[in-house]
Amino acid sequence: TYNLRLEYVQNKTEYALMRLLWQEPGKNLKEDAIQLAQNSDLVILCMGLSPLLEGEEMKVKVKGFAKGDREDIQLPETQTELIKAIHKLGKPTVLVLLNGSALAFNWEAENIPAIIEAWYPGQAGGTAVADVLFGDYNPAGRLPITFYKSMQQLPDYEDYSMKGRTYRFMTETPLYPFGYGLSYTRFSYGKATLNQSK
């Protein structure tokens, strides 16, 4: 828990705003996280992006992001370094992704046994993720977009042919295709029938 002290003075503004935002972790934060992981039975890593990184015309100084434009689709490098360092500890690890767009996380997909895509889950997101992790809720979602392995799988922005665009025209194997999703339950779809009464 953290104690926060907020002071607000009404000036000539019409509104007030407070945000808690992601910032690039410093060296001490990484060491602290590794120390916490060493003393834990299980590690739940919440990684990804924020609207500050993905938003338009944002002033951020993070490698791979330029004023809201993504120069790469990988997780931020500092996050990947932390994930790899914690993975070396040999602790059971769950990766919870928080983002609003597709990410490339090839190493994590191969090495982290449990990954949950939470998107931007809102104020009750922690409870929702906990319900999934503890088995109180059975996840059954499917990806509404394709997750590519790298920028090289994306079609050229200036090429307006359909080759490689969306899951329908992609010939390579993506990291996770449109519609991908796992569940604690096995689902099967049979031959659908329609009883037309009119």
Q: At which residue positions do the language-model features occur?
A:
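C-terminal non-catalytic regions of proteins with extracellular/luminal or membrane-system context
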Residues: T1-K198
